[in-house]
């Protein structure tokens, strides 16, 4: 089994060398960071839809329009039992790969066997049919999951398995994409904190390349099931 690689140190070293080649300090100065924030604050934004009311309700409605299925539980601690019910209803085995960040939940108590590792890439070794992830945040405007990669959050977990189950705290639902990027800058804006990859998932993978007929699961998960923790 491969060991996840933390690339943040390598990325920081590359940026340091680039800045050094331009005879600039190794890290961004407070003045430079302030200039960036000022630019972002002043930069004109395009028209945005008016989103009012409960973001959770809007997110659920839009997710279901994108062919995701949605369940709700009070807390993330209740998610393992909800996952077990979903897997049983779909006729799937109670096995999954999971983000290491979620491994502390009581999966064994719910009867779900999880492995905190990336999915197998070689199908000859046995494909992993279910991947369980969290999310960085979610967009009420479009019913979209925003997922960032890292040592505790493998990007392949929501890309390779046929079924993707995502756990979403209601407190992490924001209005739209602009709000998600603002949250990312606020929480992970440092040079060594930005994720290597950011993916936005709006329902199952699909294509209409052949005769404009929509086919699900063409380039990724066939199913996307979202469990919202309403009080987290």
Predicted regions and their residues:
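The feature marks the mature, well-folded catalytic cores of soluble enzymes
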Residues: 1-232
């Amino acid at each position: 089994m491969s060991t996840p690689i933390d690339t943040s140190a390598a990325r920081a070293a590359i940026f340091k060398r680039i800045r050094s080649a331009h005879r600039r300090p190794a890290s961004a100065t407070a003045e430079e960071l302030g200039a960036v924030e000022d630019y972002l604050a002043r930069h004109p934004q395009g028209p945005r839809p008016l989103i009012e009311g409960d973001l959770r309700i809007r997110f659920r409605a839009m997710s279901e329009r994108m062919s995701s299925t949605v369940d709700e539980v009070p807390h993330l601690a209740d998610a393992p039992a909800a996952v077990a019910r979903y897997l049983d209803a779909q006729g799937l085995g109670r096995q999954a790969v999971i983000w290491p960040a979620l491994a502390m939940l009581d999966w064994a108590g719910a009867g779900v066997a999880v492995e905190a590792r990336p999915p197998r890439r070689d199908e000859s070794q046995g494909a992993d049919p279910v991947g369980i992830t969290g999310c960085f945040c979610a967009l009420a405007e479009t019913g979209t999951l925003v997922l960032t990669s890292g040592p505790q959050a493998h990007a392949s977990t929501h890309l390779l398995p046929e079924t993707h189950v995502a756990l979403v705290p209601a407190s992490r639902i924001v209005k739209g994409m602009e709000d998600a990027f603002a949250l990312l800058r606020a929480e992970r804006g440092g040079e060594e904190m930005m994720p290597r990859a950011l993916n936005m998932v709006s329902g199952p993978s699909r294509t209409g390349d052949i005769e404009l007929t929509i086919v699900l699961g063409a380039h990724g998960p066939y199913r996307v099931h979202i469990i919202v923790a309403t009080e987290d």
